[in-house]
């Protein structure tokens, strides 16, 4: 995984390679999926949950640039793998399910870093309001049906996401835009 998926795709940050080399992906999938835990695409976990491809997590960590003074929120896809990768790299780590964010679940008021372990169609206020001023967010973003890795920063109370690269990130349907009729 380190040599054939991460390094060949430009993920070379030592802290990313060290963490991904030390956390066994097979511990985060059902017994029947252990043999495909390192495949270069998402592993379905059932019930709409998934373990994203190694490259997705590697690029997310690299773009997040976590620090020990970060208070961090991970919006989970259901595997717990991203949280385990990040835990020793940040000061405080909370996790929440995508459905809980969409439902407006209360929690810590602000975070310096938010990672969304999946792709979203839009960034809801329920999530952007949890990002402190000058805080960072790393997420998958669905644009015209294509998923991309995106980053953002909260400036003057507003978060703008900047797409970085097309990458196969499973969609978190709790963040789908309401369907509207149009010509």
PLM feature segments, named:
Residues 69, 131-137:
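Short glycine-dipeptide loop
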Residues 83, 123-125:
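Short, well-ordered alpha-helical microsegments
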């Amino acid at each position: 995984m380190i040599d054939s998926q991460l390094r060949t795709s430009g993920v070379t940050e030592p802290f990313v390679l060290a963490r991904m080399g030390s956390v066994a992906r097979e511990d985060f999938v059902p017994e029947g999926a252990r043999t495909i835990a390192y495949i270069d695409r998402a592993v379905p976990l059932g019930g709409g949950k998934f373990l994203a491809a190694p490259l997705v997590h590697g690029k997310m960590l690299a773009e997040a640039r976590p620090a020990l003074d970060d208070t961090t929120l991970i919006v989970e896809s259901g595997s717990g793998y991203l949280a385990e990768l990040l835990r020793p790299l940040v000061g405080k780590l909370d996790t929440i399910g995508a459905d809980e964010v969409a439902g407006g679940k209360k929690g810590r008021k602000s975070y310096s870093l938010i990672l969304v372990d999946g792709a979203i169609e839009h960034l809801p206020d329920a999530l952007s309001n949890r990002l402190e001023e000058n805080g960072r967010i790393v997420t998958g973003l669905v644009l015209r049906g294509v998923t991309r890795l995106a980053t953002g920063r909260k400036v003057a109370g507003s978060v703008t996401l900047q797409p970085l690269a097309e990458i196969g990130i499973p969609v978190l349907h709790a963040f789908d835009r309401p369907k509207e009729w149009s010509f």
